[in-house]
Amino acid sequence: MKWVTRAKVKVDRVACPWLIRTFIDRDADFLFVPVDEVESVARKTGAIPYDVAGVELGHHGEECSFDAIVKKYNVKDKAVDRLALIVRGADTPRRDLTPESRGLEAIAEGFKRLAAAQGYDDQETLRRERHLYDALYLYCGGDAEKLRRD
């Protein structure tokens, strides 16, 4: 599967690829483009758009894109449900939704600044933050056997 979203990833646009590669498609490809190009790139490449306004796998009401993907792909995992609350709090104005949400938002902002300072791209951000989400998943009671080993 191929996916596309806005460039300059943070929280939801990092958590969603982690979710997809862990529970839906381990070989998923992700494209990061300027927001005004997401729709056209999705059409041209057949990529599934996420975390942009007006798409199925975006924010709806108080929920974020992570929630939408969990529902659409029927991910049934209690630790993912708990992680979804943390991500939702970090990615929406509801920072107090969980005690961990503010911390995740702060760490995500730090990674964003690190990427800007060191000049690495969104793919590298995904690579660097993958273990953060693995750790959060285990903190939420997840099964280590479900995590990618590559």
Where do the protein language model's features map onto the residues?
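Extended, well-folded catalytic/binding cores that form a central cleft or groove in large enzyme
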Residues: 1-8, 17-150
